[in-house]
Design a protein with these regions (language model features):
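Generic detector of solvent-exposed, compositionally biased contiguous segments
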Residues: 54-73, 211-217, 222-224, 228-231, ...
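Phosphate/oxyanion-binding active-site loops and adjacent basic polyanion-contact surfaces
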Residues: 195, 199, 229-233, 446, ...
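Conserved phosphate/pyrophosphate-binding and hydrolysis machinery centered on Walker-type P-loop NTPases
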Residues: 189, 193, 321, 370, ...
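A structural signal for short, well-ordered beta-strand segments and their strand-loop junctions
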Residues: 92-94, 220, 255, 674-677
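Extended, charged low-complexity regulatory segments
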Residues: 1-200, 204, 208-212
Length: 687
């Protein structure tokens, strides 16, 4: 007989589970109060008895720490239970182990495990638990999961999905497949939110394989636009924190994200899944830190802006060259050349009677070749003085030792990293490939090679505290940047992005290039696009074709291209579209321009029409829901119910990078897409 066979029985059972959760929360609240009271008693006792002996103090300290730890665990348990009250679970499988023919176990699956002490059993299993993997990976019939005890085989006889909101079951669906299409379609039809949401209820089989992959030391995820790759990567982090509890915590993970807005946009996912937020940084910040923030330089946003607004063939060539593997190979050869030619040993007069021969000093420089060049000077000095002491019984003072090290350091002709970098371009016969801007500002493309050289000279100062590194928007980083990351972070990595969405096409990386840069890596692909309707996805495919992309069969309005007589009429037309949006059921509208300067100009023009429009710029630190005007670069990774793309004429969109920006902009739309342009310019070649 099936446990809770009817919907009525399921609804009654849900209320029983919620009641049990409430009871457990009340019990934990009582327990928290007891721990607080006990800690206060200890505090009062210590305050009143200042003459107690050290043994008693030590014993009490242990008791206090123990109560404090227990109290924190109980508070954490209460927090987790409070989180699941509204939606205790979302799925169920009935599983019978092969070895146990009589017992069919109903497995209810939710965000967190809930174990009832009275019944002595799990009422809810965490979605990350080994047994829960069958919900995502298997249909009805034979199934298995991997447990610490080994592979468990059996049969799934029932699979259900539920929509529960605020403790009430809205509906349940019998499902023979992994995630029922009706559930998926309902979730995809919902409005965009101001924060990325968890997707545990709709994780697909191919996504689940990525989330639970614990074998790959470097996992590279190539995911098409709208495939959920960022969300999947964050769910993967949540899974690893669960599966490797005790070995890794949220503070051991680092996310490299494109900007502060995107970092804010994704900040809710891990807390929703019951984990703490993870530290984040940017590639630019990492590279600046390596070179000790010594040099003024372009940032990535400024490089992209220049490529969009004022590109020159020389600038593009410099970016492309520094993103090649040939460039890395030559840089490695130059580092070897520098080791063999930049150190010119000379005799050092240590005392009136003792001279250290240049040949001996040169031998020591080569002896310690495993050390980074500038780290050798200290080791060489110690070794030379040790030899002098053995041979001449000579004792040297600290100032004399420092003077010797200073003399040895002077023998190396490369104490200015920037000058060495310039030397490199002379050495390869391409001095034109290095160019500083006004006020000696470096180009962004020079930052990673300079950091790479700095590591060769000074050592990598490996960030060993980071146990897992997550890199988003992988396509926007060059191979030399990945080489620097390899040296700084020798940990496991999850790297994700989409080659079709590069805002840096002249210095970008494909999944295969990243694999080559790390000399390892497992590539997994996400080809299904869930964000946009079939019509919007098909439209975007004409701009940037991708044969691997599989659109979801969710239909909606066809994208519109609206021509206007002139710019003034185009602005008025966009204002009318904004008014239509206000009267719709949609909650987010993105007006996406090619550049930030165009976005700022549009905001100025719109001041006479509305005061509820926000500018999302490179200076922004948070994503705001509602009507937003922004650039394609800043919109990357975000999604909107409706998108309007102004100025889609051939004058504005004509280059390769323009095409990438247009593709990024169109793929931000979930339900509705409109492009506008003035007929005073030719229509866009990409449409």
């Amino acid at each position: 007989m099936i446990f809770n066979q009817t919907e009525k029985q399921e609804k009654e059972y849900l209320q029983q589970v919620i009641t049990t959760i409430h009871d457990t929360i009340n019990t934990t609240s009582t327990s928290v109060k007891e721990h607080i009271d006990t800690l206060q008693e200890y505090k009062d006792y210590l305050w009143s008895n200042k003459d107690i002996d050290p043994h008693e103090i030590r014993s009490m300290r242990e008791s206090i720490l123990n109560h404090f730890a227990l109290g924190e665990n109980v508070i954490d348990k209460r927090r987790r239970l409070s989180k699941i009250l509204d939606i205790p679970y979302f799925g169920r499988i009935d599983f019978q182990e092969k070895k146990d023919k009589s017992q069919v176990s109903p497995i209810y699956i939710g965000i967190h495990t809930f174990y009832d002490l009275n019944q002595k059993k799990n009422l809810i299993y965490d979605w990350r638990a080994p047994i829960s993997s069958m919900f995502y990976d298997h249909e009805l019939g034979e199934a298995f999961y991997s447990s610490p005890a080994g592979k468990i085989n059996g049969t799934i006889s029932l699979k259900r999905q539920y929509r529960i909101r605020k403790g009430k079951m809205e509906y349940m669906i019998e499902s023979s497949v992994t995630v029922h299409d009706d559930i998926l379609q309902k979730e995809l039809c919902s409005n965009a939110d101001n924060k990325m949401k968890n997707i545990v209820t709709t994780i697909q089989r191919e996504q689940n394989q990525i989330i639970r992959n614990e074998n790959a030391s470097v996992l590279i995820i190539q995911g098409v636009a709208g495939s959920g790759k960022t969300s999947i990567a964050l769910h993967r982090i949540a899974y690893l924190l669960y599966a490797q509890k005790g070995q890794i915590s949220s503070k051991d993970i680092l996310i490299i994200s494109p900007n502060k807005v995107f970092a804010d946009y994704i900040s809710n996912v891990l807390p929703e899944l019951g984990e703490e937020t993870v530290p984040e940084t940017s590639m630019g910040q990492i590279l600046s830190d390596v070179i000790d923030n010594k040099y003024k330089h372009q940032n990535f946003f400024e490089q992209v802006t220049e490529l969009l607004e004022n590109p020159t063939p020389d600038f593009i060539e410099r970016i492309q060259y520094k993103a090649s593997f040939e460039f890395i190979s030559l840089l490695d050869k130059f580092i070897l050349y520098m080791e063999n030619n930049y150190f010119k040993a000379t005799d050092i007069k240590l005392t009136k009677y003792i001279t250290i021969p240049a040949e001996f000093i040169n031998e020591q420089f080569k002896r310690f070749h495993r050390y980074p060049i500038r780290q050798r000077f200290e080791t060489m000095t110690d070794y030379i003085l040790e030899m002098m002491q053995l041979q001449y019984n000579l004792t040297v003072s600290t100032p004399e030792k420092n003077q010797l090290k200073k003399e040895i350091k002077k023998m190396f002709a490369g104490n200015n990293a920037l000058q060495i970098y310039k030397d490199f371009f002379e050495w390869i016969g391409k001095p034109e490939m290095f160019k500083t801007r006004k006020n000696r500002i470096l180009e962004y493309a020079d930052l990673a090679p300079l950091a790479y050289l700095h590591i060769a000279l000074n050592g990598n100062n490996a960030q060993s505290y980071v146990k897992h590194l997550l890199i988003d928007e992988m396509q926007d980083y060059s191979p030399i940047q990945y080489k620097v990351i390899q040296k700084l972070y020798p940990c496991r990595k999850t790297i994700l992005g989409d080659t079709s969405q590069s805002v840096n096409p002249y210095g970008s990386s494909t999944a295969n290039m990243i694999q080559k840069a790390f000399a390892t890596g497992e590539i997994m692909k996400l080809c299904k696009s869930y964000r946009s309707t079939f019509e919007i996805t098909s439209f975007a495919q004409k701009i940037q074709p991708n044969n691997e992309l599989e659109p979801i069969m969710r239909h909606g309005e066809h994208p519109k291209i609206l021509p206007f007589k002139n710019t003034e009429e185009e602005i008025q037309g966009i204002a009318d579209l904004v008014n239509s949006f206000r009267n719709s059921h949609y909650t987010s509208l993105g007006i996406i321009c090619k550049t930030e300067s165009q976005a700022k100009e549009l905001v100025q023009k719109f001041q006479i029409y509305a005061n509820d429009i926000s500018l999302l710029s490179n200076q922004s630190s948070a994503y705001v829901k509602g009507i937003i005007i922004t650039s394609a670069h800043m919109a990357k990774g975000l999604e909107f119910d409706e998108v309007i793309i102004p100025q889609t004429d051939d004058k504005n969109y004509h280059s390769n990078i323009d095409k990438s920006m247009l593709y990024v902009a169109t793929t931000r739309a979930m339900h509705k897409l409109t492009l506008t342009y003035s007929v005073s310019s030719p229509s866009c070649r990409f449409l």
